Amino acid sequence: MTELQVGGVTPLTTIDFPGELAAVVFCQGCPWQCRYCQNTHLLPRSLRSQIAWPEVLDLLQRRRGLLDAVVFSGGEPTLQRGLPDAISETRTMGFKIGLHTAGCYPERLDELLPAVDWVGLDFKAMPEDYLALTGARGSGERALESLDYLVESGVPHEIRVTVHDALLPPDRLQRLIDLLADHGAGEVMLQRCRTQHVLDPDLGDNARPWEHAARCSAAQWSNGPQQADGS
């Protein structure tokens, strides 16, 4: 029996898988402690699943014909060993598969990519700046390795960069965009960092992120993906 810790489900979204009507399954647990994380209730690995995976399957069964896709988000979905089986069961029901990931586990991502139709990869900073943001040593290198696996796979994808004035000033952001281009990344979307209810209460206001748009090339602004509501 597939074991997947689920922290919440969004039954319908139009923005988490471009061009598709999708449900989002928020997987519990994340190995990183990103300062601007707003889904802090999804960080602990030890919490019991808020929704049993069979209940999620029942929900998806009832929504066949109404939805095009299911997106596995988090937390960090690749943390969970049950994710491949959950993806297989969902695909068997006729849904396309989307995946939101920060690239924490490159090898696991590489193994999953043949079963995935679209990936939203959160790329947070220049690799050498990751430790100050995630609190995890080697996280930048793992994210870059995941990007390379993703590009090599040919799976359609979007790179999402969260912009905060203090964490990613214009010069660092432009360097990051150039790095992503050098590695063959697809569309790069910038999303404004929202500082309410984040993991680090001392992060401070994000006053003028739109100024970055005028200074940085090859990227667009987006409203960002859904947050988990626990429903």
Give residue spans per PLM region.
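Auxiliary Fe-S-binding modules of radical SAM enzymes
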Residues: M1-G19, E152, D165-S231
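Residues that line or immediately flank small-molecule/substrate-binding pockets and catalytic motifs
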Residues: T13, H41, G74, F123, ...
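Canonical Radical SAM [4Fe-4S] cluster-binding loop centered on the CxxxCxxC motif
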Residues: F17-I51
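A secondary-structure boundary/capping signal
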Residues: F26, S73-G74
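Conserved alpha-helical substructure of the radical SAM core
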Residues: T40-V70
